[in-house]
Amino acid sequence: MAEQSDEAVKYYTLEEIQKHNHSKSTWLILHHKVYDLTKFLEEHPGGEEVLREQAGGDATENFEDVGHSTDAREMSKTFIIGELHPDDRPKLNKPPETLITTIDSSSSWWTNWVIPAISAVAVALMYRLYMAED
């Protein structure tokens, strides 16, 4: 069932997909498409455990992080059984927040340049005053 026309798309709810999280029925989501990887578990080059950890949920981020080859991406199309229901797409887990804060692209330039520049000037002046006392 590699290629599906828009008319024949089968939609699955997140609740349905989450029930298929064991070795006898292993489904996962990649880019809102639902894959039945049950028959592929033993053939997966990274081992069956990798797939089973993601079973019943969204594996998109992990799939992309690994950097799968073009061949792997083409092969994955043969396991598509449908798509995640559009109403459930917003429910997908967002990546967990980390302790590392990232600078928001909307933050102003002064927080990135002016504050460090002023700090550097202050340190330079303090050094100069300290050296002038000697």
From Swiss-Prot:
PANTHER family: CYTOCHROME B5
Top-level taxonomic group: Eukaryota
Disulphide-bridged cysteine pairs: none
Cytochrome b5 heme-binding domain ranges (all copies): 9-85
Originating species: Homo sapiens
N-acetylalanine modifications at: 2
Function field: Cytochrome b5 is a membrane-bound hemoprotein functioning as an electron carrier for several membrane-bound oxygenases.
GO-annotated molecular function: enzyme binding; heme binding; metal ion binding
Disease per UniProt entry: Methemoglobinemia and ambiguous genitalia: An autosomal recessive disorder characterized by sex steroid deficiency but normal glucocorticoid and mineralocorticoid reserve, male undermasculinization, absent or disturbed pubertal development, decreased levels of erythrocyte cytochrome B5, and excessive amounts of methemoglobin in blood cells resulting in cyanosis and hypoxia.
SUPFAM superfamilies: Cytochrome b5-like heme/steroid binding domain
Membrane-spanning residues: 109-131
Gene3D superfamilies: Cytochrome b5-like heme/steroid binding domain (3.10.120.10)
GO cellular component entries: cytosol; endoplasmic reticulum membrane; intracellular membrane-bounded organelle; membrane; mitochondrial outer membrane
Residues bound to heme: 44, 68
Sites bearing N6-acetyllysine, chain numbering: 10, 19
Record protein name field: Cytochrome b5
Family: Belongs to the cytochrome b5 family.
Keywords per UniProt: Acetylation, Cytoplasm, Disease variant, Electron transport, Endoplasmic reticulum, Heme, Iron, Membrane, Metal-binding, Microsome, Transmembrane, Transmembrane helix, Transport
A Pfam family that the UniProt record links to this protein: Cyt-b5
